[in-house]
């Protein structure tokens, strides 16, 4: 029997703050997931932007390989999600509505795309997104085996420059 896979990415999370002997943040739930699953102790970002970095994670290629910059990602590009789908996995996800994720979710069996146009409206885990995710997993709404991808934006908004200030020098 194939295992179910829960794949979580957290926008703007620094690994050095949340794991290892020198960590400076308290993360009991992440620690619990790590103890029960797989954690990669050495990670190096392929790019300094979310879209480019995630494209590298999902394709195992550097962004320069196929000209990805920011959220410019073709749904025709082979990803690990396509491979899991071909292997019989039900693909589901909770992602923001950036262009990158729109392309990525075109091949999903189901997805909840939450609004990102107005940064204040990004769903946070504590504002209902977490409950939706738990409900999806515990009520067997996904066919087995499943691959559930979650991209969390909870720690991102404090670092986001408001639109009205983006063009200022």
PLM features per residue range, with description:
Residues 1-169:
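Catalytic domains that recognize anionic headgroups
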């Amino acid at each position: 029997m194939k295992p179910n896979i829960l794949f979580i990415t957290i926008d703007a999370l620094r690994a050095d703050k949340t794991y290892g002997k020198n960590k400076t943040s308290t993360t009991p739930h992440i620690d619990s997931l790590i103890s029960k699953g797989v954690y990669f102790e050495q990670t190096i970002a392929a790019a300094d932007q979310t879209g480019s970095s995630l494209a590298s994670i999902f394709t195992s290629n550097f962004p320069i390989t196929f000209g990805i910059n920011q959220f410019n990602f073709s749904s025709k590009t082979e990803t690990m999600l396509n491979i899991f789908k071909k292997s019989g996995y039900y693909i589901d996800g909770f992602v923001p509505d950036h262009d990158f994720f729109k392309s990525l979710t075109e091949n999903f069996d189901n997805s909840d795309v939450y609004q990102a146009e107005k940064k204040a409206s990004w769903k946070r885990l504590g504002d209902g997104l977490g409950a939706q995710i738990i409900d999806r997993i515990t009520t067997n709404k996904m066919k087995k085996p499943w691959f559930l991808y979650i991209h969390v934006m909870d720690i991102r908004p404090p670092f986001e420059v408001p639109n009205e200030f983006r063009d200022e020098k």
